[in-house]
Structure formats: structure tokens, C-alpha cells
Amino acid sequence: MISDFGRLVTAMVTPFNKDLSVNYNLTRKLARYLVQSGSDGLVVAGTTGESPTLSREEKVELFRVVVDEVGGRATVIAGTGSNSTSESISLTQAAQKVGVDAVMLVVPYYNKPSQEGLYRHFKAVAESTDLPIMLYNVPGRTSVNILPQTVARLAEIDNIVAIKEAGGNMDQISEMRRLLPDGFNVYSGDDSLTLPVLSLGGKGVVSVVSHLVGGRIQEMINAYTSGNTTLATEIHLELFPLFKGMFITTNPVPVKTALSLMGWEVGATRPPLAEASPAEKESIKNLLESMKLI
């Protein structure tokens, strides 16, 4: 059972055509590029991939296409989380059939389950599959925070092996690291907290900004893990404006805007997400110019 999905995992955008249908050909090209530019793994149809507005059929085809393109060269992690346990089980099983390496399960949103409800949800999905599972905590979107004690309970299940922690709470991450067994990997879900999470023994990051500077983020991680904390800090501070600038409005609007400015025609976001405002687009353009990315 793999628990190491790599240090740098990119939460991949979903490219759309002008009519907002999924652009599977560009998905292939982007997946190749991300792996070539430093990504050890890819999350497909996660938050950054606009999972709420993708159909089940689109998700499964995205999983299949990315496995076909980069399977064996990078870890392919399917976003199969839902606020319906039965739907999450069904999509996880479909993802397993097309050959993904792992699945990522977001904390169920909107219906606000208790900690016991969260435990039962994730346990049920885990029992339905042989795939390794990465939990995904993002209370700013789900309105529910999975507590370190609940994660520790779930870590006793063989195929629940990692968590993407995007709550932005370093105290919570510290408590997770204290309670969790060796081999259970904690990933930062925030680009700007990658280095702090590494300092607490975290594994790496599930990144958005790696679409733009994957190689440089990999250099930062490698510097830290090899003991060159001075260089790691220098790279972190260099990239910090980009880490913050890609979240000036709802993700993935800024990163899709940035990719478009860099020549990647990944298309707009599906409604109800709106495009970047003129002021936001100008801010992103200025940031990319200052980083010499365009």
C-alpha cells in the first residue's frame, strides 16, 4: 500500500473548450507538462479541477485520460469525495477500474456531519476499495473541520494513508503530527504553508502554484529536505507573492487566468464561478511580469 505520493503534487485545473466542454486533448498536454516541470503526482477533479461542476462521466474520463498519459511516471490521484457516502463509494470504485493510483476524499460539505459521521463516512469508502486514500480537510469550503483525533482514528485503517490539510492552522497540523503514526503523510493544502508544514515533518504540498513554477517549488522542497534551510527560505520568500496572488479571488479563477496569460488556453471556469475582474486580471498580469513568467 503506497502512502508516498511524492513531495510535490499538483491539484490540476480542468481545461475547457470555448463552449465549456472538457478539453481532453489539452488535459493530456497539461498533465505531461506538469510532470515534466517537477510534479511527482497529479490530483484530477479536485477543487482546483472544478469538481462541483463536473459530471460523473466527465470525472471518470478525466481519470482515464490522465492515467493513460502519465500513469507510471507520476502518481494519479482521483478526486472522488462527495457529501454522499454512497456516491463517493461509487465514484471511487469507478476510478479504481480505470487505473488511478489513489483517491482523495474531501470532508463532506454542506450537510455538516459530526466527527463520528466523518469517521463512518471515510471508513465506509475505505472498505469499498483497495486504493490508498488521502483525506482532504478544507473547512473554509466545507464548513466542517476534521479534528486531529478523528484523523488519528482513521489512520488505523490500512488504506487511509495521508491527509491534505488546508485549514491553515499550524497548531492543528502540529497536533496531527503528534498523534499520527510514522508513515502517515501530512501534505500542506496551502502553497504559502509548504515550508512551515515541512518543518513539522510534513511530506510536501498539494499545490496550485506548481502549474506556474513547479520546478522552483520542487527546488525549495529539495533544499529543505537536504538540510539547506537557508536556500529553502530564500525560495519561499521569492515565491511568496505568487503563493498569495493566486488566491486573490476564488481558486481556480486566478491560476486559470495566469495560465491563459502564459499561453495555455485552459478556458474559463464553469458557472457559478465568474471570470477574474479587469482589476484582478491586471494584478495577475503584473505579478507574472514581476516574476518573469510572461
Swiss-Prot record:
Transmembrane segments: none
EC number assigned by the record: 4.3.3.7
Name recorded for this polypeptide: 4-hydroxy-tetrahydrodipicolinate synthase
Function, in words: Catalyzes the condensation of (S)-aspartate-beta-semialdehyde [(S)-ASA] and pyruvate to 4-hydroxy-tetrahydrodipicolinate (HTPA).
Class in the EC hierarchy, top level: lyase
Subunit annotation: Homotetramer; dimer of dimers.
Pfam families to which the protein is assigned, alphabetical: DHDPS (PF00701)
InterPro entries per record: Aldolase_TIM (IPR013785), DapA (IPR005263), DapA-like (IPR002220), Schiff_base-form_aldolases_AS (IPR020625), Schiff_base-form_aldolases_CS (IPR020624)
Keywords in alphabetical order: Amino-acid biosynthesis, Cytoplasm, Diaminopimelate biosynthesis, Lyase, Lysine biosynthesis, Schiff base
Protein's cellular compartments: Cytoplasm
HAMAP family: DapA (MF_00418)
Reaction(s) catalysed (UniProt annotation): L-aspartate 4-semialdehyde + pyruvate = (2S,4S)-4-hydroxy-2,3,4,5-tetrahydrodipicolinate + H2O + H(+)
Gene Ontology BP terms: diaminopimelate biosynthetic process; lysine biosynthetic process via diaminopimelate
Active site per the UniProt annotation: 136, 164
UniProt record similarity statement: Belongs to the DapA family.
PROSITE patterns: DHDPS_1, DHDPS_2
Site description Part of a proton relay during catalysis, residues in chain: 47, 110
Originating organism: Pelotomaculum thermopropionicum (strain DSM 13744 / JCM 10971 / SI)
Main location class: cytoplasm
Any Gene Ontology CC annotation: cytosol
Pathway linked to the protein: Amino-acid biosynthesis; L-lysine biosynthesis via DAP pathway; (S)-tetrahydrodipicolinate from L-aspartate: step 3/4
GO molecular function: 4-hydroxy-tetrahydrodipicolinate synthase activity
Record-listed pyruvate binding positions: 48, 206
Keyword Amino-acid biosynthesis: yes
